[in-house]
């Protein structure tokens, strides 16, 4: 079928240390049942052969554009650079170590047009150790955009970018916060707040790869913990606006846990800026002195004390967690 008069769909794909996976990712898009695509690969200064592999595919397929970063800039900057050159009427996001079903674009495009909505949300499947496990959502969260927004704030609808298919104008004036991890948790509420309609397509169309230890969604770093910390701080006032008292407490609980984890990880393997560490410490001081600090359990009470008064406890925790992760990966 000719592409004339068929909407262009842009797909933004950050690529970092994905040499063993990026080929499968690209080919899953090349072989879509809908072909009018703009495939944007942003290679984020990978030290492996990811960039060369992207270039090899681009030479053979004029739908592919490759952007190269000279150094690692982070996934938010990478996605923003992709968004800057989007030409399509619709936008999807895929991570370079994941892949998608061959009908993903066609099914999402059909749904968004027939249902006349701003965004289609679909299911993912988790791929780990060769096994694929579908993850489904409760359709009651999608009665209307207000219900979906509330469910998103509460983490009942995953905040991933990669299981959503947007009208391009949803991103017209929005960009991701750079220099932080878990940016999805911060940007999705902002995007959803500006939408008027939503549809849930109850099919697993995206395959999330848990086997890549270099995954851009990895949670095992001080930077990742700081990103989680910031995302929960960001969502507290959004929950307050909706009168979600219990979820405000949940956000505080998660922010404390993320902060004490981030401080411990950073003491064991320094990577955060001083102002980022101070940001977490100041928050923890305020919570420690608060009369209504949420219950965080004995373990995190010890880590909170360590972060504020006995850094050796936090550092030991960081080393222990990194050690456990190394053991887990070796099994």
Over which residues does each language-model region extend?
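Glycine-rich, basic loop-to-helix element that forms the pyrophosphate-binding segment
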Residues: 69-86, 107
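A conserved acidic beta->alpha catalytic loop
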Residues: 35, 43-52, 71-73, 95
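Donor-binding/catalytic cores of nucleotide-activated saccharide
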Residues: 96-199, 209-210, 214-223
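Membrane-interface aromatic/basic loop that binds lipid-linked glycans or pyrophosphate carriers
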Residues: 268-331
């Amino acid at each position: 079928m000719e592409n004339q008069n068929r909407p262009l769909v842009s797909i933004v794909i950050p690529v970092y240390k994905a040499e063993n996976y990026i080929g499968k990712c690209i080919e899953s898009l090349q072989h879509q049942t809908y072909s009018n695509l703009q495939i944007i690969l942003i290679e984020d200064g990978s030290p492996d052969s990811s960039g060369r592999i992207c270039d090899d595919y681009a030479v053979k397929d004029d739908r592919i554009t490759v952007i190269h970063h000279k150094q690692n800039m982070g996934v938010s900057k990478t996605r923003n650079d992709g968004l800057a050159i989007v030409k399509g009427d619709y936008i999807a996001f895929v991570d370079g170590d994941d892949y998608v079903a061959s009908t993903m674009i066609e099914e999402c495009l059909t749904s968004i047009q027939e249902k006349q909505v701003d965004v289609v949300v679909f299911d993912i499947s988790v791929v780990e150790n060769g096994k694929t496990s579908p993850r489904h959502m409760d359709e009651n969260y999608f009665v209307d955009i207000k219900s979906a927004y509330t469910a998103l704030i509460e983490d009942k609808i995953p905040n991933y970018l990669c299981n959503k298919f947007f009208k391009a104008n949803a991103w017209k004036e929005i960009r991701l916060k750079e220099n932080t991890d878990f940016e999805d948790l911060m940007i999705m509420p902002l995007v959803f707040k500006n939408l008027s309609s939503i549809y849930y397509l109850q099919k697993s169309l995206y395959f999330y790869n848990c086997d890549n230890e270099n995954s851009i969604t990895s949670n095992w770093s001080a930077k990742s913990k700081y990103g989680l910390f910031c995302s929960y701080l960001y969502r507290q006032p959004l929950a307050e606006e909706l009168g979600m008292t219990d979820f405000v407490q949940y956000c505080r609980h998660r922010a404390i846990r993320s902060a004490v984890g981030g401080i411990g990880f950073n003491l064991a393997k320094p990577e955060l800026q001083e102002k980022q560490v101070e940001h977490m410490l100041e928050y923890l001081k305020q919570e420690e002195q608060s009369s209504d600090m949420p219950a965080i359990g004995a373990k995190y009470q010890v880590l909170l004390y360590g972060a504020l008064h006995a850094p050796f406890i936090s550092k030991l925790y960081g080393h222990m967690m990194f050690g456990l992760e190394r053991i887990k990966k070796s099994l």
